[in-house]
Amino acid sequence: MLYSIENREGEITMILSLKTELKKAFNNKLFYLSLIINCIITIIAGIVSVLYSKKSFGMIHASENPWLPVNTLYQYWIADDMSSVAPYIFYVLLPLTACLAYGWSYSTELRSGYIKNVLIRTTRKNYYISKFIATFLSGACVAFIPILLNILVVACFIPAVKPDIYYNFSYIHYSGIMLSKLFFTHPIMYLIAMTLLTSLFSGIYACLSLALSFFVKNKIAVTTVPFI
């Protein structure tokens, strides 16, 4: 009975600790800055890809165009878009923006002494678990939300036509490379998988920044070293 009560109290403190960390992670200026930077880049990438598509293929007689399967959302969304430098900038900066979102928080709280106040209300284990979960989710969101925005922008103007393997080498994601089978057979699942993978790695980068802060106390170094 006593063990059950203690276990229940541990769960409550864990939940409260996680809620606190999530609130801090998603309600700080650097998270918003990272998110805004990435959203601006992906929206610009979407607009440029739409303009490039219009210029290259035109939409006047799209239904009669034999190259219609090439002029598809799955060719022009940010993961496969080669019409501008914006997608490259997004993916190059992603490790930095992921770490900037909340990866620096532990080093800041350690230097300020805030962590001592936190550990009065919860255990060190709960604090660390909550910190890593919140950091991962914040890092994942600064990738997921901008990519979703890019997809929405492109999808408003370019149809989600299923890719045709007949035009194999007209696609960036041609057969034989990662997830190419999924790209040609179930493109929407490919799009979801690539978005989730990017978000996953973005969250991992953020957690690397957090892990580094156990050894390095400088906030700038903690944020930028995983990017390098």
Q: Over which residues does each language-model region extend?
A:
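Secretory targeting signals
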Residues: 38-103, 133-206, 210
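Helix-loop-helix units of permease transmembrane domains in multi-pass membrane transporters
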Residues: 102-138
